[in-house]
A protein has these predicted regions:
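Structured secondary-structure scaffolds
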Residues: 1-271, 288-320, 334-341
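S-adenosyl-L-methionine
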Residues: 280-284
């Protein structure tokens, strides 16, 4: 009331120091004359290349010790090149623009190419990118849009998905030295001992795999033992992709056994084709497959890979039971080929072999299965019976039921 104070907004924005005192980085196209005035390096002298023969063991910035490299003539004046280099974020903040015009020798990117390709449909990365790299990238796009009205791009990424980490238990010996899973063994799955001298191991919490804690798993070893498809299947089946994956040998073995079951199911399909029966439940099988196509397509769009794997377990149980009943050859081929196509992103090597064996029964069409909407339409309609405005009953009747 006494008007002794006034409103003021203090922004927490600060200048961003983009230079670094190190060799590995993009040279800054700035030089200094003998009076220490700033001089722009002419475009015809760009790009500036870093010296290849350099001693990285010197104190401070290694480029400060490269006298010959720093000496440059600009407009007949002796100048000294800037020895600071740009932070790596400066380069990584607009690399996707360069991908649009990779062969352009005159400019970093072409506006017409940007209009055609950008923005990026989907960005997938660690959660730390959301507060660093993506923030810088957006700033660059805003700045370019501000400086060039033809740029017309402010949001570089339409979608962001941050995946979880792969985790594993940690192990230490009696001297608190980290141990790798290959250096220990267990007979009961609870108590662990060292392979070398049979000393009990301290089991720590499950943490994201890292070389420092030595809780990593060699993927090549897993692939050699179980196959690439089993490794791929387990990683996607264990948990939602935005959550951490808890690595376990039991989980790997479970995925491996499921692929074996799928192979036996494949053999049943091949055997069933030779019978050429008249199907009693062809319509039900086709309806089930179309429902599965719809589920998996929707789950793919929302990155629900673990739910898709659960759908495949249900699919196995359904067809393992249905193959005991008569199915027409046409229905069998059409539905099974679609099933293999649905499986292909998850177990590509397996489905490639299966489709090869099915090649004589089908056209060479590897497009993603489409849902037949008519088949999925409900055959029944719901009729609500009201008397004097009050609901008395609900009837579920077939669409083709007559008035009588």
């Amino acid at each position: 009331d006494r008007k002794l104070g006034k409103k003021k907004i203090n922004f927490r924005l600060k200048d961003w120091g983009i230079s670094r005192q190190r060799y590995w980085g993009c040279p800054i196209p700035i030089a200094y004359d003998e009076k220490n005035n700033i001089v722009k390096v002419p475009e015809k002298m760009l790009p500036i290349s870093l010296p290849e023969k350099i001693n990285l063991n010197t104190k401070g910035n290694p480029l400060d010790h490269q006298y010959e490299w720093t000496q440059i003539q600009i407009d007949n004046k002796k100048c000294k090149l800037e020895t600071d280099t740009l932070d790596t974020f400066v380069d990584s903040s607009w690399y996707f623009l360069r991908f649009c015009s990779p062969k352009n020798k005159n400019y970093g990117f072409d506006i017409d190419d940007i209009k055609y390709w950008m923005p990026v449909d989907q960005y997938i990365g660690g959660v730390e990118h959301a507060i660093l790299h993506l923030l810088y990238s957006r700033f660059f796009m805003q700045a370019l849009n501000y400086k060039n009205e033809n740029f017309n791009l402010t949001e570089p990424f339409q979608g962001l998905f941050t995946q979880g980490m792969v985790c594993h238990e940690t192990y230490k010996d009696e001297n608190n030295n980290w141990l790798s899973p290959d250096e220990i063994f267990s007979k009961d799955g609870k108590n662990f001992f060292t392979n070398e001298n049979n000393i009990k191991v301290k089991v720590g919490p499950s943490e994201s795999m890292s070389k420092s804690k030595r809780n990593t798993i060699d993927p090549e070893k897993m692939i050699n033992n179980y196959g690439a498809d089993a490794v791929r299947l387990f990683i996607m089946s264990d948990s939602p992709p935005e959550k951490d994956v808890q690595w376990s040998t039991e989980g790997m073995e479970g995925s491996y056994k499921f692929i074996q079951k799928l192979w036996l199911l494949h053999k049943k399909f091949l055997e069933k084709i030779s019978y050429n029966e008249k199907g009693d439940n062809d319509e039900g099988i086709t309806k089930y497959t179309n429902t599965l196509i719809l589920k998996i397509t929707n789950n793919l769009d929302s990155f629900r890979y673990n739910v898709i794997i659960a759908n495949f377990y249900e699919m196995y149980n359904f067809f393992n039971k249905e193959l005991a009943n008569p199915i027409s050859k046409k229905t069998l081929i059409e539905n099974y080929v679609n099933i293999l196509k649905l499986l292909s992103p998850f177990v590509p090597h397996f489905t490639s072999e299966c489709l090869k064996e099915f090649s004589k029964f089908r056209e060479n069409d590897n497009s993603w299965p489409k849902v037949n909407e008519e088949i999925l339409e409900n055959e029944n309609v719901t009729i609500v019976i009201q008397i004097n405005g009050k609901k008395r009953d609900i009837l579920n009747v077939k669409k083709d039921t007559n008035e009588n």
